[in-house]
């Protein structure tokens, strides 16, 4: 039987299982989408019971089939999600949706007693995002659902809850508590004092390569504590680039620049410019810039396609014009992004009248996006830093125009494409390598 590490990779849309062999190649994978249900307030949420059953059945089926010997299991999930347990260790809440609206005025006392919204957000590296801050979720349950709160004995972030299903151990990890939770004091690298003031006790985080031995369906298996997916995605490149500082540009709907080498604490200027911090499994801050630029690109691709009557993916077939790139850099015009970037961003159709061709419009759009990306990278780079490489992962690493503009606007660094697939799952697997 082939020895493997099983990874449960939970996204908002797809729930996946991967098996990695001793060379960290994927030898099996499976995925499933789940219908949402309603929480106790009637708001849509993931069906945690169905997800639990699926995970446990997947592991059991692999064991029974006999083709693979599972030596370790680990978990990676999206952030901003908590589960609450009672004294009997039973889950007493649904998996509340982090998109659920909250009135931040209900928490003004927390901010007021801890230096105000700006200072509290800076210190915890957590912009005031409502439900996206799991610390705020805790206070919301405490204030609005006392019947539930009075039963709470333990609070787990999503990855640690999945680990708990197999180990029955209450754990925490640095990547989860460090992901815009408003519970972690990044100045002192410990839990923030407000938790003690509110009589909220959270488990001390452990390092990501620690595991608990558990008997699962009669077999001894090392079970990791799990980790946050964004932090997990940077682990494979950290392993590859030992001794070299780099920034990872994770590109999708959001373009997130992640710098795991920043030593400086988050500033108010950075916070106001869409910067925050994550943490590595070893308790190292990952200063990050998070911008909604992928969405802008997506919206204007549709407008360009309609206006110039071409295929939606025409941009991928454009012949790279270095001369046009340099011409636009010299002109330094702002056409598409003269206003702020909102999450409900809509295209301005009339702008396209300025352009004689699809190519000229698309190049201008990407130039402006790249300028924003470079500003984000510069914001998260320490003054004395020696960043030599920018890795691009996600959809934009196939975009020749995007890569060319980045190279021209940031000539001091080498632009590389991340060839790693399933980065989050691989990162979680690498942490379990000692148990293979």
Enumerate the language-model features and the residues they cover.
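Active-site core segments that coordinate phosphate-bearing ligands/cofactors
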Residues: 7, 112-126, 139-152, 157, ...
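N-terminal glycine/serine-rich phosphate-binding loop of ATP-dependent small-molecule kinases
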Residues: 1-94, 151, 220-225, 387-388, ...
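Nucleotide/phosphate-binding loop and acidic/charged catalytic motifs
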Residues: 100, 172-178
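Residue-level signal for inorganic ion chemistry
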Residues: 24, 73, 100, 141, ...
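A charged, well-structured terminal subsegment
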Residues: 133-139
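Glycine-rich beta-strand-to-loop/alpha-helix junction loops that act as flexible
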Residues: 76-81, 208-210, 251-254, 389-397
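Active-site phosphate-binding/coordination module
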Residues: 62-133
């Amino acid at each position: 039987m082939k020895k493997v590490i099983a990874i449960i990779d939970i996204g908002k849309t797809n729930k996946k299982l991967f098996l990695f062999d001793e060379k960290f190649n994927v030898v099996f994978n499976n995925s499933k989408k789940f219908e949402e249900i309603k929480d106790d307030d009637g708001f849509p949420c993931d069906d945690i019971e169905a997800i639990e059953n699926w995970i446990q059945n997947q592991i059991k089926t692999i064991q029974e089939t006999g083709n693979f010997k599972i030596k370790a299991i680990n978990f990676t999930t999206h952030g901003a999600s908590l589960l609450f347990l009672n004294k009997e260790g039973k889950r007493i809440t649904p998996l509340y949706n982090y998109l659920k609206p909250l009135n931040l005025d209900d928490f003004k006392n927390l901010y007021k007693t801890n230096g105000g919204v700006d200072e509290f957000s800076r210190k915890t590296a957590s912009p005031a995002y409502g439900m996206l801050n799991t610390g705020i979720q805790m206070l919301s349950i405490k204030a609005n659902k006392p019947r539930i709160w009075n039963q709470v004995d333990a609070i787990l972030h999503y990855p640690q809850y999945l680990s708990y299903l197999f180990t029955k151990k209450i754990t925490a990890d640095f990547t989860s508590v460090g992901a815009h939770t408003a519970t972690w004091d990044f100045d002192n690298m410990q839990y923030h004092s407000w938790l003690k003031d509110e009589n909220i006790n959270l488990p001390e985080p452990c390092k990501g390569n620690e595991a608990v031995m558990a008997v699962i369906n009669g077999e001894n298996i090392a079970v990791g504590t799990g980790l946050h997916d964004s932090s997990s995605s940077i682990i494979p490149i950290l392993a590859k680039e030992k001794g070299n500082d780099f920034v990872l540009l994770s590109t999708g709907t959001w373009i997130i620049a992640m710098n795991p080498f920043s030593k400086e604490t988050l500033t108010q200027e950075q916070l106001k410019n869409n910067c925050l911090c994550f943490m590595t499994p070893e308790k190292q801050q990952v200063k990050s810039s998070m911008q909604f630029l992928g969405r802008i690109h997506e919206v204007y691709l549709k407008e360009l396609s309609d206006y110039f009557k071409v295929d939606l993916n025409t941009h991928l077939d454009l012949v790279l014009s270095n001369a046009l790139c340099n011409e636009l850099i010299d002109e330094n015009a702002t056409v598409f992004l003269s206003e702020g970037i909102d999450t409900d961003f809509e295209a301005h159709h009339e702008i396209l009248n300025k352009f004689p061709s699809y190519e000229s419009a698309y190049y201008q759009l990407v130039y402006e996006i790249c300028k924003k990306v470079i500003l984000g990278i510069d914001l998260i780079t320490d003054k004395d830093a020696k960043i030599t490489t920018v890795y691009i992962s996600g959809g934009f690493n196939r975009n020749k125009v995007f890569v060319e503009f980045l190279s021209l606007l940031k000539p001091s660094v080498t632009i590389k494409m991340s060839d790693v697939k399933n980065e989050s799952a691989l990162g979680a697997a690498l942490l379990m390598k000692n148990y293979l």
